[in-house]
C-alpha cells in the first residue's frame, strides 16, 4: 500500500536513536501517524518541526499497519508560529484538538483547509482569534456537532 500527499505536521516523538513517530493532518487521508526513519539527520531535521507543511510518501505492507513516511518540506511555518505568543498558543490548541478529536484515516478536507488558513499568515491578534473561533466551529461541524 502506498500513497502520496500534502500534510501539516502536528507532532513528532523520538522513536529509538534516529527515528521519529510523526502525527500529520493530511489533505485527502485525514490524520495519520507513521514512522520516519532518519528523522534527525541533517536532511530531515529541519522538516520535522510542528507546523511545517510536508509532502508525504507513506508506505506499508497493508493498510491497517503503522507504515513509514518519507517527508519533503514544502513550507516552513515553525519560525512564523513561534514568533509571538498568541500564534504559538493558537497553534498548540489546534495541534492538541486535532490529535485528540480527529479519528485516524478519516478524510476532513474542509477542516484541513481551514486549519491552513488559521495557521498561515501574519495577522493582528483580533484576526488570529477570529480565525481560531471559525476553525473551532468548523471542527465541531466536521465531527457532527455543528451549530445551527
Q: Where do the language-model regions lie?
A:
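Non-catalytic alpha-helical scaffolds and adjoining flexible linkers that form interface surfaces
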Residues: 1-20, 25-148
